[in-house]
Amino acid sequence: MVIYHIIDIKWMTIKNNSMLFLTIALALGSVIAVSTISSTSTAFANHDFVANLTGQEEVPPVDTQATGDAIFIPILPSNDTVDFNVNASGIQNVTAAHIHSGIPGENGPIAVTLFTFDPTQNPDQNGITINGTLTGINLEGPLQGKAISDLLTAIKDNSTYVNIHTVQNPNGEIRGQLSSTK
């Protein structure tokens, strides 16, 4: 947000010079304050984070036909919430999905539980779609007690992944590293 003040100096008198100075000072102060707020609140502006989920990304790799994707969208201006959508097809007996802390090729601790599911409630399941909103209260493990901005920083640093767990593969059937779309 930029605030513009237009002043016609041609018609100003000496008496109004102090008013001109005050107006300019207030305008500059407003621009500086708004710029400071905007730079912190838009740290992740235009950054959606995505993951393509496959069995080959699991550690060790899992032989499965299941695939999926996940998208995480920071909600501006505060970046203290993240909307997400996780889809998977060709997958059965899903028990949970998480964001884990971990670099590619390594397993890591759970940072966020996206959902848990009782597969006996839907035995004919052949896919899953889940969406929701994350806040700081959802953070656990290495991110417990931290802010959503810490999760976003970890995602941006390529040190988080999404995986979906099943009865057949309790450590994860499909996985994908989260990365920025920018």
Label each residue range with its predicted role.
Residues M1-A45:
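Secretory targeting signatures
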Residues L20, V34, T40-A97, S101-K182:
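Metal-centered catalytic cores of metalloenzymes
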